[in-house]
Amino acid sequence: GLGDVYKRQVITFTAACASSKSSSEGETFRDDNVAMQSAYQFKDIHGEQLYAAKKYGVTPIDSRAKLEDNHRRLKLVESNGYYLIDRLTDSSPYLTKGAKNVLKEIGKRFQAELDKGDYREHRIVVTSMFKTRRDIERTRQAKNNTDDSSAHLYGTTFDISYTRFNRTGKSGKAVSNETMCNILGKVISDLREKGECWAIFERSQHCIHVTVRKI
């Protein structure tokens, strides 16, 4: 159950997109010096993300203890063939149905683009999802600032690393993290243009912060 999930996690609070460097599934490669094309350095206004989060998301939940009893509108998100869920430290593996569907679509399109280039199979790495009010509070305290991650309170928002990708197969051509980060940028850009999501390029956090615009 949920309680067991939390018992297995070491609960430390770090920056929103900070995460471990390796995984027991596949092999994760990291390059913090990748250059994302300027077209994919999304700068959607936080207010737009927050408006969408409140419109399409759930009512914020105070604590992880209360999350156990109040997650009916949230869907459990687990690693699969399309994406790897990183070891979550300041969030829980839940999203709304709409957000979970968009995350899967990003993963599918990312892999389709790799396949087109005859590149080796990789998955995207998800570094943050649903946050309780207490998670937000502790993150702010740890960072000693008032960074506003509140879109994560509504289950509509997730962070995807653009510096780390998880290799799941060795057939095909080797592919650099820089190539993959721009493929990821293109995929998110296409969905953003369709009105599926808003996005913010978080250089200091090495992630793209995505808020969906659908139920």
Predicted regions and their residues:
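Short, small-residue-biased leader/transition segments that mark boundaries at the very start
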Residues: G1-Y6
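Bacterial N-terminal signal peptides
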Residues: K7-T14
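Extracytoplasmic cell-surface/polysaccharide-interacting catalytic and binding patches
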Residues: A18-L114, T211-K214
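Extracytoplasmic/periplasmic, Sec-exported soluble proteins
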Residues: S91-V102, K131, S149-H152, G172-T179
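Stable alpha-helical elements in mature extracytoplasmic
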Residues: L95-V102, I106, R120, D135, ...
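Extended, low-complexity, intrinsically disordered C-terminal regulatory tails
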Residues: G107, Q111, D118-Q141
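Alpha-helical scaffolding within the catalytic cores
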Residues: Q141-D147
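Catalytic cores and adjacent binding grooves of peptidoglycan-active enzymes
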Residues: D147-I215
